[in-house]
């Protein structure tokens, strides 16, 4: 059965994730993280993209992107993923050794309200949740750290958010959030399902041909059961 064509109109904000194939580690040393950040920067120069957030983890990464034009998200991700794959394989003497990524990137649109703030917090909190650091700003390979360093070379990649950043944002990121918020994000990650209030989600599902993402899968009904399966995504 052919896979569905991805629809990603401009003006919406998207959470984007991709994961290394099998047990590969994408980022083994600082140079690997820096190389990916360079590709991200070059992608923004080729295809204008508002980058709201990112976090690079040892075997996967998260981006929060806000494209202006229809088709930009797909073009941006295609160039970035292909370029990173080519450079990674060259740097690790792995040319011709199979796929670097599990497949095409996962993504879901986010309503630009408290749901977006929840996703931004989720992304920045990733290394804390995985016990890599005690504070999100300590993780060098994410936008939370970059914002704290005015002279950071990646600071120019960051764009403003659609809404004001809360004054106590860093404290919010580093505090334990609501289980239900994180569970809903896990479901959206697992299913590529729009994230927002019920009316917005249904409207986006129809508009973007994502109605199949709202249907329960077999006996997995409700976010508590789905998140059990999706819990390793982080």
PLM region descriptions:
Residues 1-57, 66-234:
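Short Pro-Cys-Gly-centered "Cys-loop" motif that presents a nucleophilic cysteine in a tight turn
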């Amino acid at each position: 059965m052919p896979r569905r064509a991805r629809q990603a109109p401009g003006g919406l904000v998207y959470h984007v994730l991709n994961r290394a194939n099998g047990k590969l580690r994408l980022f083994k040393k600082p140079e690997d993280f820096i190389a990916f950040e360079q590709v991200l920067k070059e992608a923004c120069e080729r295809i204008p993209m508002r980058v709201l957030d990112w976090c690079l983890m040892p075997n996967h990464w998260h981006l929060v992107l806000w494209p202006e034009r229809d088709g930009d998200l797909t073009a941006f991700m295609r160039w970035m993923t292909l370029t990173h794959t080519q450079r990674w394989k060259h740097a690790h003497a792995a040319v011709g050794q199979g796929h670097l990524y599990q497949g095409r990137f996962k993504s879901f649109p986010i309503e630009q309200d408290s749901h977006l703030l929840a996703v931004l917090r989720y992304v920045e909190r990733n290394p804390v949740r995985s016990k890599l650091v005690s504070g999100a700003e300590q993780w060098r390979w994410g936008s939370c750290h970059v914002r704290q360093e005015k002279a950071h070379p990646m600071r120019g990649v960051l764009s403003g958010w659609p809404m004001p950043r809360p004054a106590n944002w860093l404290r919010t990121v580093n505090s334990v959030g609501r289980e239900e918020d994180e569970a809903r994000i896990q479901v959206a990650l697992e299913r590529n399902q729009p994230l927002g209030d019920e009316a917005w989600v249904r409207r986006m599902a129809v508009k973007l041909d994502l109605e199949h993402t709202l249907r329960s899968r077999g006996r997995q009904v409700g976010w508590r059961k789905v998140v059990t399966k999706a819990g390793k995504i982080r």
